[in-house]
Amino acid sequence: MREVISVHIGQGGIQVGNACWELFCLEHGIQPDGQMPSDKTIGGGDDAFNTFFSETGAGKHVPRAVLVDLEPTVCDEIRTGTYRQLFHPEQIISGKEDAANNFARGHYTIGKEIVDLVLDRIRKLADNCTGLQGFIGFHSVGGGTGSGLGSLLLERLSVDYGKKSKLCFTVYPSPQVSTAVVEPYNSVLSTHSLLEHTDVAVMLDNEAVYDICRRNLDIERPTYTNLNRLIAQVISSLTASLRFDGALNVDITEFQTNLVPYPRIHFMLSSYGPVISAEKAYHEQLSVAEITNSSFEPASMMAKCDPRHGKYMACCMMFRGDVVPKDVNAAVATIKTKRTIQFVDWSPGFKVGINYQPPTVVPGGDLAKVMRAVCMISNSTAIAEVFSRIDHKFDLMYAKRAFVHWYVGEGMEEGEFSEAREDLAALEKDYEEVGIETAEGEGEEEDMAQ
């Protein structure tokens, strides 16, 4: 089996995780107590969903996941919530004091006390796997736990499981919506280690997802539950090929191979379509071409940046439901002819996966049940916009050394700030260089021909 272990860190990571496991359970017909009436093989079984769930002798399905937070509230919600029987109590780990939006607390003082316990639990899950494929991390980098403990865990996982791939779903601070003043510090410090210790990081940002909920689902004031359920659809589409048997299946390592041209350039943009409310879906069933086009719209992007300002280096489209390769090829061909969607000249660009399992929606949720959906995850130079925005905010505060004493007081050195900031400046430069026309001399002749 090619198992995957999910690691949910901090409030953001756990709440996105909640939405994901809720959706996975629905997709596989697993009840909140872990029973799965449709599953006839008791025990390990070689069913595809066993990549994400392990089976006990009693026929209970337990997510291969660890949920960690430095303060107990969010974990307690799970311990008392609908899915309280789904997780093994040891998989939910909570500390007693908060990281208080402080990277240094999550990474040095408080995180250090809990990290060995977490790694021990992960080791138990790993021992339970026959062929561990890798890890999927869920966290946000604005707060203290997701950024600090998140980076610490990723660093330690690199040491313990060097060759296993690590895919991260990372919620970045939004341009307008801010939950903490020190978000830029935490994000920059955290990205510094994401650069080294993850293979692929999918960037999400609350504001972009808010706008999608508001615009496409007519939700006037979206809650985190609305946002997380939409994000869960993206994560579900990306992992569907690991959890179901399909025609064109995609492995975690395959994402990496197809999306990352250079090790540092591994921050991905994602989008999902169709996002329509139940009332609208009643009147329209969207074709493959339509959902493909909509997934390239700047408004569909789950991070605030405009792909029209950048070039695509690679693009992975995961279709699910009633989709045949012929339609996909036609849709992709149309995309390639569009002038607004530019690829770098050294990369042909598309990888496609098809999974015949139709998309599932949470009953009573906002999303409509549709026949087919697509999730696009792409590597575009436009994502540098996200970094430059955060870097700019970082610079404004750091020039005055505002709030820095909180970090230094928790055992960080001021040098780490400038080191992380320089690393990000280098990353912005890397993105710039990748986008510049590579084959010089050839470009001019092509212009003449046009």
From Swiss-Prot:
Post-translational modification note: Acetylation of alpha chains at Lys-40 stabilizes microtubules and affects affinity and processivity of microtubule motors. This modification has a role in multiple cellular functions, ranging from cell motility, cell cycle progression or cell differentiation to intracellular trafficking and signaling.
A Pfam family it matches: Tubulin_C
Positions with a binding annotation for Mg(2+): 71
Chief site of localization: cytoplasm
Cross-referenced SMART domains: Tubulin, Tubulin_C
Role: Tubulin is the major constituent of microtubules, a cylinder consisting of laterally associated linear protofilaments composed of alpha- and beta-tubulin heterodimers. Microtubules grow by the addition of GTP-tubulin dimers to the microtubule end, where a stabilizing cap forms. Below the cap, tubulin dimers are in GDP-bound state, owing to GTPase activity of alpha-tubulin.
Official protein name in the record: Tubulin alpha chain
